[in-house]
Amino acid sequence: MTTQKYKSLLVIIWALWAFHPCLAIDDVLRTAKRDAILAQITGAVRPKKQISLISFGAKGDGKKDCKPAFDKAMKRAAHMGGAHIVVPAGEYLLNGPIHFVSNVCLELQEGATLKFSSEPAFYLPLVKTSWEGTFLQNYSPFIYGYQLENVSIIGKGVIDGNAGTTFATWKSKQKIGQQLSREMNHKEVPVAERNFGEGYWLRPHLVQFFDCKNITIEDVFITNAPFWCIHLLKSENIICRGIRYDAKLVNNDGIDPEYTRNLLIENIEFNNGDDNVAIKCGRDNDCLLYTSRCV
């Protein structure tokens, strides 16, 4: 009986030794594949020309509406072919969204806070977006980019959605809009006819880049989002690194990649009221129509 046990043990040891080279080869292949993917993920190319938000009339006193200054800075950046927009320390009230243009790096320096208004009307008119996997028109995300290249949000500053008193209360009212959006999805209603917004209670995202390439979001602190914090929709070549969260309102997912490829997420401090990372590929018929390869 003892001899039989030793024979069994010898067989097991021999089997492990025999397959060890194969396991080592598999590890090498996996590492090579991983490294090949990582080599493709470069994030945004950052422009060298710098402009200060202050030069466009912004004031970091927490009282003056700085949306016009952001709009002017983005317009200037577009005219320049790209720019690095620097936001120095201070609290910047925004009565409405920031709409990015291509080739812009938005740097929130340490001590800088973007504090968005809690007034829903400021996030109209409607923009092309997606809500829980259905493409539609809805309130603008607070920071939004559509069909852009080379966009960055960096720095040790804060993005405060300030959504606790309004948008965070909408979940109990959203059923009418949620059901209608899904019906339109199932019936394949043209996306241009799926108009929501006021009266439908579908909360906007805090940050959304839609159909964009070459994105970097790095080091910023995110809090009080109205819905998902960072929504990366139909986008590619993205780096999310060093982001810090204290976002515990309803459905404050950290990072939601949807129909997205070549995304690196690393060194994140999650403290979220929902999923930290939720990989998505749309919903129902929209998913079947728009699914693309994700890596």
Predicted stretch roles:
Residues T2-I13, W17-C105, Q109-E218, F227, ...:
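Extracellular "leader-to-stem" segments immediately downstream of a signal peptide or signal-anchor
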Residues G197, L202-L288:
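Internal metal/ion-chelating core segments
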Residues Y290-V295:
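Conserved small/polar residues in nucleotide/adenosyl-binding loops
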